[in-house]
Amino acid sequence: MSDKHINLVIVTGMSGAGKTVAIQSFEDLGYFTIDNMPPALVPKFLELIEQTNENRRVALVVDMRSRLFFKEINSTLDSIESNPSIDFWILFLDATDGELVSRYKETRRSHPLAADGRVLDGIRLERELLSPLKSMSQHVVDTTKLTPRQLRKTISDQFSEGSNQASFRIEVMSFGFKYGLPLDADLVFDVRFLPNPYYQVELREKTGLDEDVFNYVMSHPESEVFYKHLLNLIVPILPAYQKEGKSVLTVAIGCTGGQHRSVAFAHCLAESLATDWSVNESHRDQNRRKETVNRS
């Protein structure tokens, strides 16, 4: 990107999904940040940035706290998109209704759209109203299972200096179905049909990243056949996703607990795709069982 360009990230999403942590993360990365920016003021603010030699990496939180949000957001985005000197991305933070309710109960704050005080009603209305904006977003992050530290790392991985947000990147992740589907997944594959290392006593406490577990999972004939078909399905469609302008494609592979089979498969897939593509590998639930045991 040209140094004359403004690199703008608009941070939005569900109330309670982590926008405060997100904007603090951008500040730590060296972005000029503003929280609770009225949409109508964004174009004028960007004009001022263009006229200076100040930091041209900008992150703005634009959300439901602005009373005129829905009247102004579309015209604001049109104005930004028509400016050739601005490269911009929308980061949409989401979480399940149950998790958002839990967070509101913990903080004892009211939801901006809960006129009668019913948090869940406010969340459902907000989700409905934000649905079009979410569909426009280049980056959707589900924070349901993320700690603040994990969210900071996610943002750092995607937006730190030197990363190319405009490039196409593949996120390969493993997860456990018992802990819920990842909301930000584009493609989901189920490997629960494979033999489960959990029932091998010597493998139970290990993960799919351990060599003996990995070999156990991948050596079965069913694994070899499925993995071959998985590659044959995914690899040919990657250029099409890139051509359509998608910046991040999230491929999620799940097993029961997210500790053995899905971890091994996700690791294998990430290594295969990394020969030709930019790939990040993550394992959402691989240590969750151990954490549960330790807390009990």
Swiss-Prot record:
Binding annotation for GTP: 63-66
Pfam families hit by this protein: PapZ_C, RapZ-like_N
Record-level Gene Ontology MF annotations: ATP binding; GTP binding
Domain of life of the source: Bacteria
Residues binding ATP, per UniProt: 13-20
Keyword vocabulary terms for this entry: ATP-binding, GTP-binding, Nucleotide-binding
Residue pairs linked by disulfide bridges in the UniProt entry: none
InterPro entries: P-loop_NTPase (IPR027417), RapZ-like (IPR005337), RapZ-like_N (IPR053930), RapZ_C (IPR053931)
Protein family (similarity comment): Belongs to the RapZ-like family.
Described function: Displays ATPase and GTPase activities.
Identification of the protein by name: Nucleotide-binding protein spyM18_0713
Source organism: Streptococcus pyogenes serotype M18 (strain MGAS8232)
